[in-house]
């Protein structure tokens, strides 16, 4: 059932698509994207990453008749009460990654040292057309720099410094970023679950 299984990546974010394809490569699945279908995605109205990922994955699975994998992820700055959180992609109503980074730096201009600690969280939901769904999560701790560093990645990557690596996500290649990142950890949890075939449904079912 596994090798060659068709799975739709339920995201229009090119950066996420790149990282998901790289991370899922060992499974040998045939990965399709939203560009292969004429779909209008639902609004993300969930209060949590899990709710949003489930909403997207279940919608695409039902619409296409194929398993769908959605990623909902974001940055949580502790001193800002967890902002931007589920609003990471539309923080402050800003339209571009650069504008959102500038807005975040402005919100944090009074914060120093330990006050700049943050974490990235990712929740992957794999939903099937029959209604079954599974969730895989990952997170990584870091610090928000006072100015961007690096040219790679997307989103808040130029600001998110990983002390363990001594770099921002934007200073890492895909492979190195996957070793440390929230999305990489969630993907490894999924790979582990599927290494011997699909996990038992009674264990992995999302209620």
UniProtKB/Swiss-Prot annotation:
UniProt cofactor(s): Mg(2+)
GO molecular function, one term: XTP diphosphatase activity
Enzyme class of the recorded protein, top EC level: hydrolase
Any one annotated GO CC term: cytosol
Residue positions binding substrate: 11-16, 73, 154-157, 177, 182-183
InterPro entries, per the entry: dITP/XTP_pyrophosphatase, ITPase-like_fam, RdgB/HAM1
Stored CDD domains: HAM1 (cd00515)
Record's catalysed reaction(s): XTP + H2O = XMP + diphosphate + H(+); dITP + H2O = dIMP + diphosphate + H(+); ITP + H2O = IMP + diphosphate + H(+)
Cofactor comment text: Binds 1 Mg(2+) ion per subunit.
Superkingdom in the source lineage: Bacteria
Residues that, per the record, bind Mg(2+): 72
EC number(s) stated in the UniProt entry for this protein: 3.6.1.66
Keyword terms of this UniProt record: Hydrolase, Magnesium, Metal-binding, Nucleotide metabolism, Nucleotide-binding
Keyword Metal-binding: yes
Catalytic residues as annotated in Swiss-Prot or TrEMBL: 72 (proton acceptor)
A biological-process GO annotation: purine nucleoside triphosphate catabolic process
PANTHER family in the record: INOSINE TRIPHOSPHATE PYROPHOSPHATASE, INOSINE TRIPHOSPHATE PYROPHOSPHATASE/HAM1 PROTEIN
Family to which the UniProt record says this protein belongs: Belongs to the HAM1 NTPase family.
Subunit structure comment from the entry: Homodimer.
Record's function text: Pyrophosphatase that catalyzes the hydrolysis of nucleoside triphosphates to their monophosphate derivatives, with a high preference for the non-canonical purine nucleotides XTP (xanthosine triphosphate), dITP (deoxyinosine triphosphate) and ITP. Seems to function as a house-cleaning enzyme that removes non-canonical purine nucleotides from the nucleotide pool, thus preventing their incorporation into DNA/RNA and avoiding chromosomal lesions.
Name of the featured protein: dITP/XTP pyrophosphatase
